[in-house]
Every structure is written in structure tokens, then in C-alpha cells.
Amino acid sequence: MMADGAAAGAGGSPSLRELRARMVAAANEIAKERRKQDVVNRVATHSSNIRSTFKPVIDGSMLKNDIKQRLARERREEKRRQQDANKETQLLEKERKTKLQYEKQMEERQRKLKERKEKEEQRRIAAEEKRHQKDEAQKEKFTAILYRTLERRRLADDYQQKRWSWGGSAMANSESKTANKRSASTEKLEQGTSALIRQMPLSSAGLQNSVAKRKTDKERSSSLNRRDSNLHSSTDKEQAERKPRVTGVTNYVMQYVTVPLRKCTSDELRAVMFPMSTMKIPPQTKVEESPLEKVETPPKASVDAPPQVNVEVFCNTSMEASPKAGVGMAPEVSTDSFPVVSVDVSPVVSTYDSEMSMDASPELSIEALPKVDLETVPKVSIVASPEASLEAPPEVSLEALPEVSVEAAPEGSLEAPPKGSAEVAPKESVKGSPKESMEASPEAMVKASPKTSLEASMEASPKAKARDAPKKSEMDKQALIPIAKKRLSSYTECYKWSSSPENACGLPSPISTNRQIQKNCPPSPLPLISKQSPQTSFPYKIMPIQHTLSVQSASSTVKKKKETVSKTTNRCEALSQRHMIYEESGNKSTAGIMNAEAATKILTELRRLAREQREKEEEERQREEMQQRVIKKSKDMAKEAVGGQAEDHLKLKDGQQQNETKKKKGWLDQEDQEAPLQKGDAKIKAQEEADKRKKEHERIMLQNLQERLERKKRIEEIMKRTRKTDVNASKVTETSSHDIYEEAEADNEESDKDSLNEMFPSAILNGTGSPTKFKMPFNNAKKMTHKLVFLEDGTSQVRKEPKTYFNGDLKNFRQKSMKDTSIQEVVSRPSSKRMTSHTTKTRKADETNTTSRSSAQTKSEGFHDILPKSSDTFRQ
């Protein structure tokens, strides 16, 4: 371009080229400066985070691509940095929020854990308190039970002391008294244990401990009892040496009889029969050693005699004793029951006694008491004695006498005083249940009596010891235990008292042997006999009879026969009393002389006491039950009261709700009932309003018709007045006006029909051209206003004169409904059109008839006075 310009400048003016070159250079400099300024501004905007807008170069030059790319890259990086910063801030905000939420959750969890721990602690404390209260209540209960049991034991001890003091004898020495006290203490302990077993609940640990204490006390008392029995045996020994031998004297025999007990109940038996089992256990523990070590008895006598004796015993007692019970049977019953009863209570001891008595009785009874034996017991001597006397040599019989006397003497002494034995019986024998006595006593007696009797025989005559006693005891035990079980299970135990003649008649062999031993034997065996008597526990004679009165009658008959022997009874009673004292001290009882009446009195007293105690227990139980029932009833009443209050509250609420619902329903029903009434009223009102509107429309239409008729009359009058002499002009005007009038009248009639059709569509449907009868009279129709219209000559303007009111009812006529105005507007529109057409026709007529212009003008004025009036009135 520079070259072209220079070439052109060479041919033209050089000043223009220079100017052009200068201008280009100046523009380039300006562009460079602007570029530099843009770069500086961009750096400044980057530093201040302000975007710089691109300013185009004035001279049209463009930036380079690398600069553009660099700027775009910088913008992108800046944008990315901003986005990263925003993201980082958002992340930090999220982390902060999550941290706060986590801390809040941890605090909530810690709070819940703390609350749970507090609740558990409170629950644990409440449970501990409840358990403590329960333990306290249980402790109080058990202490009360123990207090009651101790009180009962104290009362029983007092009663026992009073009872033992009734028949105490003055001949007992201090040692027997101490022994009696100790034996009574053991009985009290055992009674306490039995009372605890009966009365106290077995589930308590304190009671078990008390029972264990009682057992230890019982063992201790049993050892004391054995020591006392040893001391007492020494006193027996001394007294037996001092006393003379009394032979041929009969004693009172206490028969320990089993009779079916009808009056006693199971509660009485259970209450009475516990202590016996406990009393018979201690001897068993001590005596188990002796039978196998020391038992040695006469060989043939002990082996051969028992079978027959046992057979006779059980046959007679079980089969013949109870049913017959006559006078003739009394000897047999007594003789047979003597060994049998001891078999029932202590089988082995009874076999020893029966053997020795049957072996020893024939010779001694014949030698000592010939009269008594011949008169009373021929059968016994025949049945029992022959084989025994033949088989038993004199040495054996003499050596066996100590053993016989060991068992026979205490029997006689025990049987003689009924009172003491009756007192022993209620405590020791009557209170024992059949099974317990059957199971416990045989073992105890088997292990106790052989020891004592055989110790006596060892000390008295050591040569007479035999080696067959264990075998015999085992055989007898095996043979007798089942029979004893059968008999004792079917009968309960009671006491039967017989007189001394019956003893003399029925039981001659043991008594006679006893007395003969006391006479003939040296004094050495007798102390042993008296020594062994205390430890032979319960050698009472037991006999299963059902009719006690018959046996008593038999005893009375025997009494009459044996009056000669009755003189010696006092001595025998004294001797037997002493024996009884010593034996009862070993058997844990005290002595006393009593008859059958006293024994029955004591028995009745004991039964009465047991009954009273049972009644007291029953009353206590009933009282506790009543208290429990009262507490339960009170709780039930409280629950029912609470429940009744809640139910009443609920019933009140339900009643209130029901009343509210009923009220609401009543309101709704009233509204429902009033709604159709209101609807009916609204319909009636609407119908009335519609009727009013219709009447108003009819009245207005009648007024319009009346006004039209009046206008027609007026037009006719005007036409008559305005007629002139010019006939032609009048004819033309008349024809034109008549045509116009007819057209206007036709238009008015059409408009009237349209208005009537709009107002009364039912008339059109019925095919009638007019509505029904008008109710409004024509006299009441309002008069419409009239106005005059003048047409000027040169123009077509209409000059209206001021409105004139023939009747001042325009104000009332304007007060119409929207329907009326709309109908009138529809009617007035065609009339205005017709009016314009009429005006054009009149103008033509005026132009044609220039001569009669004035007259035509007046007619047209009169005509125009009618037509626009209708349009105005309808518009109004």
C-alpha cells in the first residue's frame, strides 16, 4: 500500500501520502499503547479478583492466539480455584455439622445410659428393701412360732409335773427322784420335737436347726438315762437283798390290749403317736454290739421250746381270745396272752421270756403253789410243761431262772399297780403309732433285752451260757415280725386292767417262777435281775381283743373264786410298787398307785387335753383364715371401689358424650327439617316475586296499549283539522301520510306482538296471539308524556321543544326492571329505523309538492309528533 501510495503520490499531490502515512503510524502507536494498557489492567484485575472487559482496538487489529489462549487458561484456572475454595468451605461446613451432630448424639446416649443406671439402681434398692422386709416378716413369724411352741412345751411340762405329783410315793429315794427328773426331761424334749413336727411349717431353716438341737439333746439325755438306769439298778440290788422272798402272791396284771379304736380320729392318733418312735431309737444305737458278742443261752431249752409256745400263742390270741371272752376262757387268754403280748411289742424278748417261763414253770409251780396251780392252770402245765421239763435238765432250768426273773419280775411289778402303769402308757405306748412301734420297737427290744438278760445270766451263772441264742433270736424275729405287723396294723392300742385273781389263775408260771427264784436262788442273781429290769423297755402284755368288758367280767368272776388269795395282795402291791418305781425310772416315768377308775380318769383327762389343744389349734387356724379372708375381702373391696369409681367416671363421660351426640343429632335433625321449609319459603318468595314482576309487565303493556289508542285518536283529530281546500294536494298528502301511517301502525303492531311474545311465551305456545285476561283495569293506566318535534325548511335538523308532561308520572315510570328496559330497547330500534325512512319519504313528497308545502309541513309535523314519541318513551 505504501508503494501504491507512493506511486500515486508521484503522479498526484505528495502531501496526502505523507498525511496518510502519518495517520497509519499514529494509529499503530495508539494500538500498541492500548495493548500495553490492557495487559497492565488484566494483571491488576487478577490481583484484585476483578474481571476486565475486553476493549476492541479502534483500528481493527486483533490480539494474537497465544495471548487469547493464555488469558482463557488463566480464566479457567481462576474459576477452578474458586470452585475448589467453595468446595473446601462446603466440606468444612459439613464436617462441622457432622461433628456437632455426633457430639449431640453422644451426649444423648450418655444421658440415657445415666438414666437407665439410675432406674436400675432404684429398682435394685427397692427389691433389696422388699427382700429385707420379707426377711423381717419371716423372722417375726418364726420367732412367734417358736415362742408359741415353747409356751406349749412349758404348759405341757407343768401339766406333767402336776400329773406325776398326783401318785408320788414316799418310799422313793433321792436317786430315783433325780433319775425320774432326768427321764422326764428327755420325755419333754421328745415331746417338744413331736410338737414342732406337728405344728411348725417344715420349710423353715430355723425349725430344722431346732429339730437338730432337739436330737442332740435327746442323745445326751439318753446317755444320762443309761447312767441313771445303772445307778437305779444298784439301788434295786440293795433293796432286793433287804426284802424277803414272797412266794405264792398274785399281783395285778396290766394287760396291754389292742382294741379297734372307734372314737379317736386320725388327727388325735397323729398328734399322740409321734414321740414313741423317737423314744425307742436311742437304745438301738448302744445295744447293737451285745447280742453277737455275749449271747449264750441254754441250748435245748431255747431251741425246742419256742416253736410250740409261739404256735399256741398266736393261734389262741388271734383266733380265740376276742370273740369268746368268757369265764372259762379267761385262764387261756391270760396264759396265752402273756407271751404273745411281749411278742407283739418286742418279739425276741417275749420269746426269751416265754421259753424260760415255760421251761421253768412246771417244777416250780408244783413245788411252790400246788393249790393255786391245780385249781387254775391245768392246761398250761399240760400244754407247755411236759416237753420243756423233759428236755430241759435241772441245771439248765436253774441257770435259766435268772433270765426268767429278769423279764418276769418287772412284768409282775409293772402289772400290779394299774395307776403307775396307766400313767406310763399314755406317754410311751399310746402315743406310738402302730407302724412306728412295730418297726422301731422290735429292733430296739431285740437288741436291748437280750443284752440285759444275758448279761445277768453271765454274771450269775457263767457256766450256763449257750451259743445258739443268735440263731434263735433271728428265727423268732423272722417268725413273729410279720404276724405282729398284721395284728398291729388292724388294731389300735389301749389298756386293759385285770385283777389279781385273774393273774393268779391265768398267769401262774411267770409269777411263780419269779417268786421261786426270789426264794430258792442265791442273792447274787437277784441284783442282776433288778439291774436288768430298767433297760427292758415296754415289756407290757399286748392282746388283740375287741370286747374289754367281757374280759373284765371274767376277771370279776375269777375274783370271787379267789378270795383266799386276796389277803396277800397288799404285800404284793408294796413289793410291786417298789419294782414299778425302779422300772419306771428306767422307762422314763414315775410311780404311783392307782386303780382302773383313776386310770380311766387320767386317760379321759389326757384325751380332753389333747382335744382342747386340737380345738385351740383349730381356732387359731380358723382365726388366721378369717383374718386372711378379711384382708382379701378388704383388698377386693378396695379394688372394686377403685374400679367402681373408674366405671362411674367412664359412665359419666359416656353419658355426657351420648347427650352431646343426641343434642348434635337433634340440631342436625332440626336443620334438616328446617332446610326444606326454608327452601319452600325461598321458592314461595321467588314465585311471589315472579308474579309481581309479571303483574308489573302486564300493567306496563296495558298502559302502552292505552297510550297508543289515545295517540291514534289524537292523530285523527289533527288530520281533520289540518285539511285544506286544495283537494289534490290533500289527496297526495293523505295518500302519502296514509301509507306512512299504515306502515307505522303495522310496525307498532309488530313491535307490540314481539314485546308480548317476549313477555308471555306461554300464549304463543298455546296458539293464541294474545295473553290471558288482564287483571289490571284500564282506568289505573298511567298516561305517557308527549313532545313536539319541528322540522326546519332548509335543513333536515329536527328541532325539539322542551318536554311537556301531561301527567307527572315520569319518575315512577322510569323505575323499571332491567328486563323491561331491554325489551323496550329492542322494540325502539326498529321504530327509529322506520322513522328515518319516513323522514326521507316526506322530504320527497315535499319536493314534489312545492305549492302545498306549508300544509304538508304541518301534517308532517303532526305525524312526527307521534312517531319519535314512542321511541323516546321506550327508551325512557
From Swiss-Prot:
Give the protein's biological function. Promotes the assembly and stability of microtubules.
Residue stretches of biased makeup (Polar residues): 171-183, 191-211, 510-521, 820-830, 848-860
Biased amino acid composition, Basic residues? 831-842
State the source organism's domain of life: Eukaryota
Pfam families referenced in this protein's UniProt entry, alphabetically: MAP7
Give the source species.
Homo sapiens (Human)
UniProt keyword Nucleotide-binding present: no
Keyword Acetylation present in the record's keywords: the answer is: yes
Which processes are annotated in GO (biological process)? microtubule cytoskeleton organization; microtubule polymerization
Name its cellular compartments: Cytoplasm, Cytoskeleton, Spindle
Compositional bias segments (type: Acidic residues): 742-752
Gene for this chain: MAP7D3
Q: What name is this protein filed under?
A: MAP7 domain-containing protein 3
Q: Which residues carry this modification: N-acetylmethionine?
A: M1
Which terms does the record give in the GO molecular function aspect? microtubule binding; tubulin binding
**Per the record, which residues fall in region Disordered?**
72-137, 170-246, 407-475, 509-533, 613-697, 723-754, 802-876
Q: Show the coiled coil region(s).
A: 65-144, 558-640, 689-724
Q: Which UniProt keywords apply?
A: Acetylation, Coiled coil, Cytoplasm, Cytoskeleton, Phosphoprotein
* InterPro entries for this protein: MAP7_domain-containing, MAP7_fam
Gene Ontology, cellular component aspect: cytoplasm; membrane; microtubule cytoskeleton; spindle
Conditions for induction: Expression is cell cycle dependent with the highest levels during G1, S, and M phases, and low level in G2 phase.
For the modification Phosphoserine, the affected residues are S185, S322, S441, S457, S461, S490, S524, S770, S817, S832
- Homology family: Belongs to the MAP7 family.
Taxonomic classification: Eukaryota, Metazoa, Chordata, Craniata, Vertebrata
